[in-house]
Amino acid sequence: MPDPAYVRDAFARIADRYVLTNHILSCGADLWWRHVVSSRIKAWQPTRLLDVASGTGDLALAIQRSCPGCEVIASDFCAEMLTHATRRGVTHTLVADALALPFPDASFDVVSVAFGLRNMADYPAALREMSRVIKPGGHLVILDFSLPTNLLRLPYRFYLHRILPHLAGWLTGHKDTYEYLGGSIEAFPAGTAMTGLLESCGLRQASFTPLTGGVVTLYQGDK
């Protein structure tokens, strides 16, 4: 699993160009992925939500727009990323480690994490901590990269390992940060492996929905 100090430093170095780079590398699909998540959350009509590993606040902003009556708190252990989230209009930000969230049990209707769990040092510990702060009847939603199981698998792996690091390096000046990405996606539990992990960490009725041919997957677990 990733080294926390490396991950924090890597994201601090690319914070200034993170949003633009994501849009380019995904050909804009990241905007749609977050729209799917925020639309699902809107249907639950939450009043208090925690967006873990919020980074520059892309998902938090989408949720603020779709759920104007909800208090959205964006947390991340990289202060440099959250500085950009605040500048972009995220109302509430908090520097916090997902492995030790500074909230009482049952504090939130929904906890969300987009493209963040994969970078955490201990997936089960992070999931247990997120589950802890969700109210009974609440929900955890996770959006993260995955490997397609169809004909896209081979070309996608080629893109991850051969094209993306060079393109991202040109955009950010930090190719090494994105060389780590492909390996982290391949090592990340996906599909039924992830839903099994969610249920072992105190969540019920875990499910997953592949998006864009399985390039990313949306997971849900209920408390």
Residue ranges and their predicted role:
Residues 99-110:
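A short acidic, Gly/Pro-enriched loop at the edge of an enzyme's catalytic core
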Residues 1-19:
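N-terminal, positively charged/glycine-rich alpha-helical extensions of SAM-dependent methyltransferases
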Residues 27-46:
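Conserved alpha-helix/loop element of class I SAM-dependent methyltransferases that forms part
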Residues 143, 147-197, 207:
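C-terminal alpha-helical "lid/dimerization" subdomain adjacent to the S-adenosyl-L-methionine
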Residues 109-123:
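A short SAM/SAH-binding and catalytic strip from SAM-dependent methyltransferases
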Residues 48-100:
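Class I SAM-dependent methyltransferase SAM/SAH-binding core
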